[in-house]
């Protein structure tokens, strides 16, 4: 999931990590 998010938006990674 992280890879997919990273591909879509660099900020997504940070948000995903915070969410997790």
Swiss-Prot record:
Task: Please list the GO biological process terms of this entry.
Answer: photosynthesis
| Family from the record | Belongs to the psbW family.
Q: How does it sit in the membrane?
A: Single-pass membrane protein
Q: Which stretches of sequence are listed as region Disordered? A: 1-20
Task: Share what the entry says about its subunit structure, partners included.
Answer: Part of the photosystem II complex. PSII is composed of 1 copy each of membrane proteins PsbA, PsbB, PsbC, PsbD, numerous small proteins, at least 3 peripheral proteins of the oxygen-evolving complex and a large number of cofactors. It forms dimeric complexes.
Name assigned to this protein: Photosystem II reaction center W protein
Q: Where in the cell is it found?
A: Plastid, Chloroplast thylakoid membrane
Fetch the InterPro entries from UniProt: PSII_PsbW_class2
Keywords of this entry:
Chloroplast, Membrane, Photosynthesis, Photosystem II, Plastid, Thylakoid
> Where primarily located?
plastid
Q: What does this protein do?
A: Stabilizes dimeric photosystem II (PSII). In its absence no dimeric PSII accumulates and there is a reduction of monomeric PSII.
A Pfam match: PsbW
Q: What is one term from the GO cellular component aspect held by the record? A: photosystem II
Q: Which gene encodes it?
A: psbW
Q: Name the residue ranges with Polar residues bias.
A: 8-20
Q: Please indicate if the UniProt record lists Iron as a keyword.
A: no
């Amino acid at each position: 999931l992280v890879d997919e998010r990273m591909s879509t938006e660099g900020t997504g990674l940070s948000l995903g990590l915070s969410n997790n």
